């Protein structure tokens, strides 16, 4: 009788060991094929050779210029306030494939670099600066599979400014150097129109400054 109980216990241990081996095999298979139960995948997904997608974006940003110094308020060569600007952006970014485990863990995070041209409608006194920057963004909230609220920050350098000059540009108390730092942060709605196209709309804040490395440096904020 004791011998039979020992055999039954041994058989039960073997069954448990087989179950553990099966679970381990499923986990290894899921890791190789990017399918994880804890991320909501019910079945094993097909193997995907590329874990990232690459994106190209074009943005148009009409901007309001905050009148933070006399030059922008109208004390300039034209005696007119500088109240608006416009920036065109070309951007490249990459991110994890949508609806994968990594995409859900990191909230749709993406990163990349961009190139922008900004005009203030006064090339003689301010110039039309060109900006190169890096950026990063992610999802804040998802309202449905196609619509989400996202954030993004940009950081880079802008060149092509017309700085203060005692003889030729003496009114410009906003910009003291030809190259300035570029800082930007914003939030926007992202609407996925199709597999290949997204439409975004939102607002942001931009600051141009040289960090007081050269004066005057009142800066420009939009």
Role assignments for model-derived ranges:
Residues 74-79, 120-123, 169-175, 211-218:
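Extracellular loop and loop/strand-boundary signature of outer-membrane beta-barrel proteins
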Residues 52, 82-88, 126-132, 177-183, ...:
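Residues that define the transmembrane beta-barrel architecture of outer-membrane proteins
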Residues 1-36:
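Amphipathic, non-transmembrane alpha-helical stretches in extra-cytosolic proteins
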Residues 65-87, 125-126:
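Surface-exposed strand-loop-strand hairpins of Gram-negative outer-membrane beta-barrel proteins
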Residues 54-58, 109-113, 132, 147-155, ...:
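Transmembrane beta-strands of outer-membrane beta-barrel proteins
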Residues 58-60, 88-94, 134-140, 153-157, ...:
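Residues on the lipid-exposed face of transmembrane beta-strands in outer-membrane beta-barrel proteins
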Residues 60-66, 94, 115-121, 155-163, ...:
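Transmembrane beta-strands of outer-membrane beta-barrel pores
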Residues 66, 99-101, 195-199:
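Repeated loop/turn-to-beta-strand initiation elements of outer-membrane beta-barrel proteins
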